Amino acid sequence: MASVPKRHTYGGNVVTDRDRHSLQRNNEILHPIHKNQRKHATFGPYIIGSTLGEGEFGKVKLGWTKASSSNEVPKQVAIKLIRRDTIKKDADKEIKIYREINALKHLTHPNIIYLEEVLQNSKYIGIVLEFVSGGEFYKYIQRKRRLKESSACRLFAQLISGVNYMHYKGLVHRDLKLENLLLDKHENLVITDFGFVNEFFEDNELMKTSCGSPCYAAPELVVSTKAYEARKADVWSCGVILYAMLAGYLPWDDDHENPTGDDIARLYKYITQTPLKFPEYITPIPRDLLRRILVPNPRRRINLQTIKRHVWLKPHEAFLSIQPNYWDEHLQKERPKPPNKGDVGRHSTYSSSASSYSKSRDRNSLIIESTLEQHRMSPQLATSRPASPTFSTGSKVVLNDTKNDMKESNINGERTSASCRYTRDSKGNGQTQIEQVSARHSSRGNKHTSVAGLVTIPGSPTTARTRNAPSSKLTEHVKDSSQTSFTQEEFHRIGNYHVPRSRPRPTSYYPGLSRNTADNSLADIPVNKLGSNGRLTDAKDPVPLNAIHDTNKATISNNSIMLLSEGPAAKTSPVDYHYAIGDLNHGDKPITEVIDKINKDLTHKAAENGFPRESIDPESTSTILVTKEPTNSTDEDHVESQLENVGHSSNKSDASSDKDSKKIYEKKRFSFMSLYSSLNGSRSTVESRTSKGNAPPVSSRNPSGQSNRSNIKITQQQPRNLSDRVPNPDKKINDNRIRDNAPSYAESENPGRSVRASVMVSTLREENRSELSNEGNNVEAQTSTARKVLNFFKRRSMRV
């Protein structure tokens, strides 16, 4: 028998341990001890919760808004957290991140994930999306084994409606698969993951980048090196998803020699040579639809309009008959207006929840832009797509730098693209030019097939989403376009380029992705610094939002803010991207300052040596002539690239220029078939080739008094894939020669070229920034010859 411990008191009473514990509990109830509550992890104005999933970029966390009052119900969001140090190591990942951000800004559809805002701190980049509580569609089919025909028909109609809306906006997803689809709480389909999204045009939608996932990618992306129709590739992926809904497994999954599908070459050879088979429980009507969609030949494959008219989708005919522009107008009315508090000039944003967020702006908040809530007001600036555009391999975008320095940039498109030139004066004289463009579009009489305008809300930092507005109405409100202004700083774009060597999982297969082409317009992210006290501070120099300068006299900085001239996702206000402490700024010197130093140096040399010299004129020193052969078919996409130097120079410089001018670059798009036939299916990622440009010819000293002039013709080759076409000059600078660096080519580009910009985000090479930043130092090093001559005569006079 166990004894109970006892303790005698002075009063003679016996108190046991049980009584003592009961007294302690009573004391805790009567006199509670306030312990320190556990602090929640926060990211900007959101409280971070559990992990919803983990993908290629990082973890997706559940978040909810901070309640400002007891009656307020927090709103749940999904925050995709991306470590910034991982972006520095992988340039492809950076492209996909900014592509997704800029594409989601322009999509307002119930079956497409909605972008709330974009946040950033010193460690993470957070993409705040709406929370879809139904889970992944892939796991949903696994639980159900297969879907009933009625349920599959409803979900497939929602998928077709969302994809048709994207195509109407001029965007293609190119990575539709079960893993990129979600379900909401009402089991409605939601399309996500826009990392491979790209822009196309009605007149020419051919693309050359092989991307997507095995089994979901169309055969023309894999077995052929020719350009493919982007919309037909999305149609194929929709057919594979429909087959998986009805059958419970993917089509062409019965190859016994390749059961796992790791051998991509054998898989697509089996797809192209084997007829489609169906399980017995699939009825004839959906079989007919699948036989029309899953056709290896894209010319025989039906389009989305034919799919919507199919008899199997007749129960959802009313839903599919809704025009895409209706979703923009309808969802804009449903969104509550954001509270108009605070200073309008401050580049702050508002949240999309029911709360007013009056306190979040005063906290250490990283709120950047709430693209969800936009109220409809008179547009200030909008652009529309021309009906019959001209083709060009390159286009120019004119920006406004933080130092008001103008630079010029060539954007090599992944495909031939339509473009329209918009030039605006910083004094607000661009109204007449916009009206001329709008009048030119309306005079053609052709109906625009897609909406291409972002309109700016007066008195608000946010922008309204695109909607179908006639050009005549848009020009009525251009007069107020000079009212909106915002502050900006340089945004550090990481240019550490390399191709990932580790083999990714089969569901994220993207071997042909590269980093140039039409993505240079994605550096359009204004920045507000985060002060030392943790509060957001505005930039000092306000710059007009619509101050688009002349392209003849200006050049572009890699870190400036781009204003897209037109296109299906053209916009006047990009995603506001706050800058974090510890980031690097590249203070590029303007090319004009470098040229001024060269002129002073040459003038000084000529005065010392007694030679007549002419100052270097940036417009006459070099002339770039960009020529392009019209691309009417997939085979006519090879353009020769030559460098010619015509002028009076030394024999060495002539020999070097002749040697450089004979190099011809031929680049073909990557083919999965060629890769796996050579590597036996051992790797799923391949390094994209990068063509290295040659340094420009040297303009040497001419003691005979003749002026050095060179006409340089550059014919750029149209890339077969998205590989870089950035020249990388690596030459020694002699004291007797003055080298013309690569950025000087952009200054005298043909002003007659039309302007076009893409919605996609791209990264620029670090070498180009280092060239611009080091030009001033190189010029100072070149002054040694004149200085030596001057010092020589000084010393000689002192001897006497």
Curated annotation (Swiss-Prot):
Active-site residues annotated for this sequence: D175
Sites of Phosphoserine modification: S365, S388, S521, S748
InterPro entries, alphabetized = Kinase-like_dom_sf (IPR011009), Prot_kinase_dom (IPR000719), Protein_kinase_ATP_BS (IPR017441), Ser/Thr_kinase_AS (IPR008271), STK_Kin4/ppk1 (IPR034674)
Recorded hits in Pfam families, A to Z, give: Pkinase
UniProt-listed GO biological process terms: mitotic spindle orientation checkpoint signaling; peroxisome inheritance; protein localization to spindle pole body; vacuole inheritance
In what ranges is there compositional bias, type Polar residues? 380-395, 459-473, 678-721
Q: What is its EC number?
A: 2.7.11.1
Reactions catalysed, semicolon-separated, are:
L-seryl-[protein] + ATP = O-phospho-L-seryl-[protein] + ADP + H(+); L-threonyl-[protein] + ATP = O-phospho-L-threonyl-[protein] + ADP + H(+)
The source's superkingdom equals Eukaryota
Residues involved in ATP binding: L52, G53, E54, G55, E56, F57, G58, K59, V60, K80
The GO terms this record gives for MF are: ATP binding; protein kinase activity; protein serine kinase activity; protein serine/threonine kinase activity
Bias (Basic and acidic residues) occurs at 727-740
Which ranges carry the Protein kinase domain? 46-313
Region annotation (Disordered) ranges? 331-397, 438-487, 629-661, 678-754
- SMART domains the record matches: S_TKc
Q: Which UniProt keywords apply?
A: ATP-binding, Kinase, Nucleotide-binding, Phosphoprotein, Serine/threonine-protein kinase, Transferase
**Would you tell me the Gene Ontology cellular component terms?**
cell cortex; cellular bud neck; spindle pole body
Q: What class of enzyme is it?
A: transferase
Q: Does the keyword Membrane feature in the UniProt annotation?
A: no
Q: Which PANTHER family match?
A: MAP/MICROTUBULE AFFINITY-REGULATING KINASE, NON-SPECIFIC SERINE_THREONINE PROTEIN KINASE
Q: What else is known?
A: Present with 143 molecules/cell in log phase SD medium.
The entry's family comment says: Belongs to the protein kinase superfamily. Ser/Thr protein kinase family.
Specify the protein name: Serine/threonine-protein kinase KIN4
Q: Which species is the source of this protein? A: Saccharomyces cerevisiae (strain ATCC 204508 / S288c)
